[in-house]
Amino acid sequence: MNENKASNRMWGGRFASGPDAIMEAINASIGFDRKLYAQDIRGSLAHAAMLAETGIISTEDEKKIAHGLNTILSEIEAGKFEFSTRLEDIHMNVEARLAELIGPAAGRLHTARSRNDQVAVDFRLWVKEELLRIDVALGGLIEAFLVRAEEHAATVMPGFTHLQTAQPVTFGHHLMAYVEMFGRDRTRVRDAVERLDESPLGAAALAGTSFPIDRHMTAKTLGFREPTRNSIDTVSDRDFALEFLSVSAICATHLSRLAEEIVIWSTSQFGFIRLSDAFSTGSSIMPQKKNPDAAELVRAKTGRINGHLIGLLTVMKGLPLAYSKDMQEDKEAVFDAAETLDLMLAAMTGMIGDMEVNAAAMKKAAGSGFSTATDLADWLVREAGLPFREAHHVTGRAVALAEERKCGLEKLALSDLQAIHPAITENIFSVLSVGNSVKSRTSFGGTAPAEVRRQVRYWKKRLKRDASLEKKG
């Protein structure tokens, strides 16, 4: 039998009895949305200031509210605030404490506001701040890549397709491929900030309010570009949270691909890199083991972030306008994805800066698998005037012969090559070394060391430009 506890709830006026204990448990979000305390208080301070400015509440009440809210902020940050599940969420917890501190004036704070627009502004502020943190972290990761790419602009390694040796490339060029990926991730982060940079405050429950509020004032106070333009849309959607998860999932996928390569490169079979003790662990039974656990966990945690994206998409897919309590499920997904991605970015930045490169092993592997076969075909087109399809066929025969002789293309005798095609001359051997192969790939974006260094210079300038944009913003 339920005790009548409805009257002391902020929404309990029309209820004759209080909720069941199970209802309280499933309804409460304070266990996770307490993370929004700073944003909630910030939004309330802006709302109270606007209410006073527009004459909706008195200046005296606004001062009491502001003092009380700042007191609550200090209590939470000092670990002295007692959160209550009975009060459901961060909004009600803060408001209840405010009433204890300043009395009836606290009841004026929620004028012209609903929890629907209140939570939307809290969450947007939090996501915006997290996106800006990710932006900085991505900048740091790119910087770590640039240092290593410049260092290894001429370090030859095998390039792969289908994880089979394809053509020689440089390690610097390979690393710069990830710079491009993470650069696009950073662009997506900034695009997401641009789209969510609208203030929901003032949309109220869904229809706006009859009070003469100034939504542009609160938007400016909270650092938003402008207020949202449709009050129903404002409280109905969480596409900014979905976009955050999408951006995070794409970035995590790039991190996972890199982590997979680090795992492969660090095996004794490849031996391309050696991870430091700082990012490795050992085995409880095999004394010789040095396991790339940090990279493996980066790879694994990508699935966690992808799961959060699919989960929230599924939550949102069938909701009618406007607000539904289903949307309470948005925050844990975003909070966990953000924490996970922050950790992944930090771990990867450390591994890239810390790894030891075995250039000799890379170069040796680059010469295997007939990796300069394309150079042979290109030489036949360029020097002998053959159509590329014919050159491709001739080169295939040369590869088959080398495979039969169990040697590299560069070890075949000139007479053997001329027996395949008479136009081949001794000059062919100049293009069959892996070093000359990478030097010849001078096309824009190619693997030639000079071109890799140009790519590095471009990205250094771009990082400086992006940093200056941050300061202007």
Swiss-Prot record:
The kind of enzyme this is, by top-level EC class, is lyase
Q: Which CDD domains match?
A: Argininosuccinate_lyase
- A GO BP term, please? arginine biosynthetic process via ornithine
Listed under catalytic activity are: 2-(N(omega)-L-arginino)succinate = fumarate + L-arginine
Any one Gene Ontology cellular component term annotated for this protein:
cytosol
* GO molecular function (one): argininosuccinate lyase activity
Q: Which UniProt keywords apply?
A: Amino-acid biosynthesis, Arginine biosynthesis, Cytoplasm, Lyase
Q: Which Pfam families match?
A: ASL_C2, Lyase_1
Q: In which pathway does it act?
A: Amino-acid biosynthesis; L-arginine biosynthesis; L-arginine from L-ornithine and carbamoyl phosphate: step 3/3
Q: Which domain of life is it from?
A: Bacteria
Q: Where in the cell is it found?
A: Cytoplasm
Principal location:
cytoplasm
Query: Which E.C. number(s) belong to this protein?
Result: 4.3.2.1
Family membership: Belongs to the lyase 1 family. Argininosuccinate lyase subfamily.
Name listed for the protein in its UniProt record: Argininosuccinate lyase
What organism does the record attribute this protein to? Chelativorans sp. (strain BNC1)
Question: What is the taxonomic lineage of the source species?
Answer: Bacteria, Pseudomonadati, Pseudomonadota, Alphaproteobacteria, Hyphomicrobiales
